[in-house]
Amino acid sequence: MSRQAKDDFLRHYTVSDPRTHPKGYTEYKVTAQFISKRDPEDVKEVVVWKRYSDFRKLHGDLAYTHRNLFRRLEEFPAFPRGQVFGRFEASVIEERRKGAEDLLRFTVHIPALNNSPQLKEFFRGGEVTRPSEVSGDLHILPPPLIPTPPPDEPRVQPHETWLPQPLPAERRGLEELEVPADPPPSSPAQEALDLLFNCGSTEEASSSPARGPLTEAELALFDPFSKEEGAGPSPTHIGELAALEAGSGRPDQEPWEPGGQAEEDDEEGEPAPAYLSQATELITQALRDEKAGAYPAALQGYRDGVHILLQGVPGDPSPARREGVKKKAAEYLKRAEEILHLHLS
């Protein structure tokens, strides 16, 4: 029976907030977001600060791995060349930021890169946090930027909090020189990171036969604009939308469908939040890409759409719509997982 790598999370990478380090070089904030496939509300983040040389090293390592995979249908993303003059110009900094972000996002649909030791080592030193705990309730003011340490920990001065801690980088350099047979003791932060970048565990493949492309009726369930004229939605979907209009206030009805009636106005007659329109646009394009066979683009579109839904749903004033958005996000996550296993693994 075949075995496949186990990955319980969908990932979303961003590279942002370039700043000048006190030593003179530019560093970038790298955020890795892990969204649980079982519970879309279970989101974890790892944040590290990296410089151009770190990205260039990762690019070389991953390019070597990708070359040995003999994947001819996709081109490994290029990375900006190093330069001595002009590297502090805004255009150069933006080019490097964009190149680094494209590199990280390229790894998402390739398990050999997504779970590579080099990628895990790249995020070594980052702390695993749960952003949903900070923004889960918008009626409560967010916590201060500088959390109060426990009594048994020394207080960090405000002007020191933005400086990157040198210890993880130094320790990482020492680990590369150490003999693998005698690794340093793992810390709780390292164990949490290892669980997210778990490239060693395997699970039995499902005994059911692999599903082929979805039928038109099934695709209609994922089509944000399936109510448009000429779209030809299935009778089942028409019935669902009719029930939605007739009983939008009932808790047992699905309160939100991208592009549907419930999105137009909320309970108080105000326009629906902007995040729904943004997510609808992304998911619609993902559907079109999937129909056209552009599976990497479709996967990215579903992931980006779900990312916007999960970021916007805590601030939605409608409790019924919040529940509907969560259900739809789970459906799109499931579809993204199917695309990954059926077409990109």
From Swiss-Prot:
<feature type="modified residue" description="Omega-N-methylarginine">
    <location>
        <position position="105"/>
    </location>
</feature>
<comment type="function">
    <text>May be involved in several stages of intracellular trafficking. Overexpression of SNX15 disrupts the normal trafficking of proteins from the plasma membrane to recycling endosomes or the TGN.</text>
</comment>
<feature type="domain" description="PX">
    <location>
        <begin position="1"/>
        <end position="130"/>
    </location>
</feature>
<feature type="domain" description="MIT">
    <location>
        <begin position="272"/>
        <end position="345"/>
    </location>
</feature>
<keyword id="KW-0488">Methylation</keyword>
<dbReference type="GO" id="GO:0035091">
    <property type="term" value="F:phosphatidylinositol binding"/>
</dbReference>
<feature type="region of interest" description="Disordered">
    <location>
        <begin position="226"/>
        <end position="274"/>
    </location>
</feature>
<feature type="modified residue" description="Phosphoserine">
    <location>
        <position position="234"/>
    </location>
</feature>
<feature type="compositionally biased region" description="Pro residues">
    <location>
        <begin position="141"/>
        <end position="151"/>
    </location>
</feature>
<comment type="similarity">
    <text>Belongs to the sorting nexin family.</text>
</comment>
<dbReference type="InterPro" id="IPR036871">
    <property type="entry name" value="PX_dom_sf"/>
</dbReference>
<dbReference type="Pfam" id="PF04212">
    <property type="entry name" value="MIT"/>
</dbReference>
<feature type="modified residue" description="Phosphoserine">
    <location>
        <position position="208"/>
    </location>
</feature>
<keyword id="KW-0813">Transport</keyword>
<dbReference type="InterPro" id="IPR007330">
    <property type="entry name" value="MIT_dom"/>
</dbReference>
<dbReference type="Pfam" id="PF00787">
    <property type="entry name" value="PX"/>
</dbReference>
<protein>
    <recommendedName>
        <fullName>Sorting nexin-15</fullName>
    </recommendedName>
</protein>
<keyword id="KW-0597">Phosphoprotein</keyword>
<keyword id="KW-0653">Protein transport</keyword>
<dbReference type="InterPro" id="IPR051866">
    <property type="entry name" value="Intracell_Sig-Traffick_Protein"/>
</dbReference>
<dbReference type="InterPro" id="IPR036181">
    <property type="entry name" value="MIT_dom_sf"/>
</dbReference>
<feature type="region of interest" description="Disordered">
    <location>
        <begin position="133"/>
        <end position="163"/>
    </location>
</feature>
<dbReference type="GO" id="GO:0015031">
    <property type="term" value="P:protein transport"/>
</dbReference>
<dbReference type="InterPro" id="IPR001683">
    <property type="entry name" value="PX_dom"/>
</dbReference>
